[in-house]
C-alpha cells in the first residue's frame, strides 16, 4: 500500500528529530525554522509480534514485515495559506498525504527557539488548524460559486447534491471546525466530499513531544492538549524524542527492553506511534505463512478476499477462486497449518469474504 502519514507542526517543535527516530534517516535536525524543505520520506517497519510468533512455528527462510510511509514536511508558520514562509510548499506536500501526525512542542528548552517566543501547544495547534481550515475554505468558496446557480435554479440533481456538501463544509469551516467533523450519509455525498481533497478531512493524531522525565505520564502542556482536543475523537501520543533517540542507539532488542524497563516504559514511543499511524490510515494486516517466507500484507480495513489477493499479484484477483483462511489464534494454539486442517479450523471463503485483521490466508486462483 502506498499510503502516507505526514508529520506536520510549527518549526522547531521536534518534527525532524521524531522522523529520525522513526526511520533512522538523517534528516537535517537543526535549530533553524526551515531545515526540512523537501519532505523526507521514510518507509517504516510496523512492529507486530504476531509475525514473529508465526515465524517461530513455521521456521521460514525469511520474514517480511509490513511497512508504512512517514513524510517529514517543512514547518508551517502563520500565513501559510497565503504562501507565507514555505506555505505553498507545505500545503502541497500535506495534500499528498493520507493522514496527519500533528507534532506539538510540550517541553521547555531555552536552547531551542520557539517561533512565537513561548511554549503553548494549544496555540500552536490552533495556528496550524487555522491555516489548513482557511485553505479549505478558499477551496470550498471557489467551488460553491460555480455550482450555486445551477443548484438553485435548474433541475441538475448532481449540482444540488454538490451544493449541499459544499454548504455544509463551508458552515463548519467558518465555525473553526475541521472538515473531518462533517459526515455524510449517501454514497453520492461521500464521493463528492472525497473528491474535494480537503486538507482538514484527513484523520489526525497529536504527538506531544515532552522532556525525558515526562515520557510516562506527560506534563501540564500535555494536559492542555488533552483538554483542547477532547471533542475531536483524536488520539494523543506522548513521546520523549531524546529518549527515543537513545533507544535507537541500542544494537539488540534485549538492550532496548532493559533500557525501557529502567525508565518505566513497556515499549518505545516509536513502536506505539508506528502502530497508531498504521491504524490512523485505516490499515490492517493479513499473513501468508510457508517454508519460504512468513509475510505480513497491508490492506485497507473492510477489503474483501479478491482485493486482498490482488495485493500479492493482480492475477490472484483476476482469477480468484477461493481463499483458505485460518484465524491467527487457532494457528498459534494448534501449531501448524495441517493441525488446523485436521481440527476443522481452516475455512473456505468466497469472493464476498471480508478479510479480518490477523487472518492467515492462502489464495486459490486460475488465470
Task: Place the predicted regions along the sequence by residue.
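Conserved nucleotide-binding/hydrolysis micro-motifs of P-loop NTPases
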Residues: 24-25, 50-51, 75-77, 105-111, ...
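Flexible beta-alpha connector loops of hexameric P-loop NTPases
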Residues: 76-82, 117-132, 151-158, 264
